A protein has these predicted regions:
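Membrane-embedded alpha-helical bundles of multi-pass transporters/translocases
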Residues: 2-243, 251-277
Length: 277
């Protein structure tokens, strides 16, 4: 950092937290560096979203020559798991763990599933397009492989994001929870912007080998980001206390019925669903 940058940082820090974005979301128990580290799971989600919706959308159609209708179908596959986010969040709320963790096991599984999808994705796409050495491979292998890859990435990112936001609200004080969630989504946007710039730079000029390198690097980055984000975040409760709390919790159907008894629930869900589409 040069001398001018140091002076700018000192001046900005001297203005107080009122001029620092989301500085008021931090508390003595949850300082801003810890919050920013936790938000790295959103960076991994943003990276996956940009890769699926933006980068591969263009690469599959232009460079690999895959029909646009098939590309649209593949990109829509991760949305299949979106309605299950309520169930995923409920299961993490009531998870029985002798280790005393509720959120960590689900985020670990989500990160591993997302990693698996990204790991097989470039090879499946090359077989699907029939380029280079994959020219003689049966197309159905590429179809099944690409569909499985997109489904795995979708399941992983939905699980990671749902449980990660639940963990953030667990750690934050009640009055600062809206600000913490806002910070998480700002980091999601940051991850999307940074990933878009990185993918664009790394894939120019395009080659099949470079596509494999970039997507598998994204798979490794997913594990690293989520590992750093989770490190010593969720406190461990006594196993017996966690089991007792889980045993006394209502079932998902009962919790869903209680939720739907509120006013205009169906209208709100339809609005969110249509807005997402």
């Amino acid at each position: 950092m040069n001398r001018v940058s140091r002076r700018m940082m000192r001046a900005w820090a001297g203005m107080g937290s009122r001029f620092l974005p989301f500085a008021d979301a931090a508390t003595p128990d949850l300082p801003l560096p810890r919050l920013l580290r936790l938000s790295l799971f959103q960076v991994s989600v943003g990276m996956a979203l940009v890769l699926l919706i933006g980068t591969l959308n263009r690469v599959m159609i232009v460079e690999l020559g895959v029909p646009a209708s098939l590309v649209g179908t593949m990109i829509s596959l991760p949305l299949i798991f979106a309605p299950f986010r309520a169930l995923i969040g409920f299961r993490s709320d009531t998870h029985r763990s002798e280790l005393g963790w509720r959120r960590v096991p689900f985020m670990y599984r989500g990160a591993m599933v997302q990693f698996g999808g990204l790991a097989i994705m470039p090879f499946a796409l090359l077989v699907l397009s029939g380029v280079d050495h994959a020219a003689g491979a049966p197309m159905w292998i590429g179809l099944l492989g690409a569909a499985a890859a997109f489904l795995l990435v979708g399941a992983g990112l939905h699980t990671t994001q749902t449980v990660g936001l639940a963990l953030a609200t667990d750690l934050a004080a009640e009055e600062s929870q809206p600000k913490v969630v806002g910070l998480m989504y700002v980091m999601l946007l940051f991850g999307m912007i940074a990933s878009a710039l990185a993918f664009g730079a790394l894939l120019a000029p395009f080659t099949p080998g470079r596509l494999i390198q970039v997507i598998q690097a994204a798979a490794v980055a997913t594990i690293v980001l989520n590992g750093v984000a989770l490190w010593k975040q969720e406190p461990r409760n006594a196993g017996s206390a966690t089991l007792r709390a889980a045993q006394g919790a209502p079932g998902f159907r009962q919790a869903w019925n209680s939720f739907t008894q509120g006013g205009q629930v169906v209208r709100r869900l339809l609005s969110v669903g249509l807005g997402t589409m």
